[in-house]
């Protein structure tokens, strides 16, 4: 299938043949949800930790005798019912990672890219290059393409410090190379702009 290419000025600049298996896949909302949740869960640190009654320091001696005081019996001052005592169901470090195999991951990315294209939220440009790190110049490119809340995806060799510096101060705008794209970044932005090189690299990765 052929897709239209735009110049950075927003004008038509030819067409590009792309793989239907990547850009014409069926929309699978359940798969996308599962992969996105798994991806975000894997980003959790899971380092929260509390101490149980056996881990809190002190409390080795019985605070008062078993009978005769009129008070409730107690064996340690580090019981959860005491101030400075341990926690009843103490949280411990854990991993929140969920297993996602390669077929599921690539299927979710294909589904997202295809839906972006079908809904008119994907734009393809010849290349994205800036000679100097100027936010004003990058903003003019965004305005010319008529996109907002946008993720720019460029080829690995196309990514440069100028692109990063020019875009980092713009709200709801991000730039990454084709290796760094993931289901979360693709669904977080309203629009996606890809260069020809990025598309070829994505196809090599997913086909």
UniProtKB/Swiss-Prot annotation:
InterPro entries referenced in this protein's UniProt entry, alphabetically: Ribosomal_uL4, Ribosomal_uL4-like, Ribosomal_uL4_dom_sf
GO biological process: translation
Disulfide bond entries: none
Alphabetized Pfam families for the sequence: Ribosomal_L4
GO CC aspect terms: ribonucleoprotein complex; ribosome
Keyword rRNA-binding: yes
MF-aspect GO terms: rRNA binding; structural constituent of ribosome
Keyword terms, alphabetized: Ribonucleoprotein, Ribosomal protein, RNA-binding, rRNA-binding
Disordered: region residues: 48-70
Keyword Thylakoid: no
Stated role: One of the primary rRNA binding proteins, this protein initially binds near the 5'-end of the 23S rRNA. It is important during the early stages of 50S assembly. It makes multiple contacts with different domains of the 23S rRNA in the assembled 50S subunit and ribosome.
Description of how the protein assembles with itself and partners: Part of the 50S ribosomal subunit.
Protein family per UniProt: Belongs to the universal ribosomal protein uL4 family.
Official protein name in the record: Large ribosomal subunit protein uL4
Lineage per the UniProt record: Bacteria, Pseudomonadati, Pseudomonadota, Gammaproteobacteria, Thiotrichales
Encoding gene (name): rplD
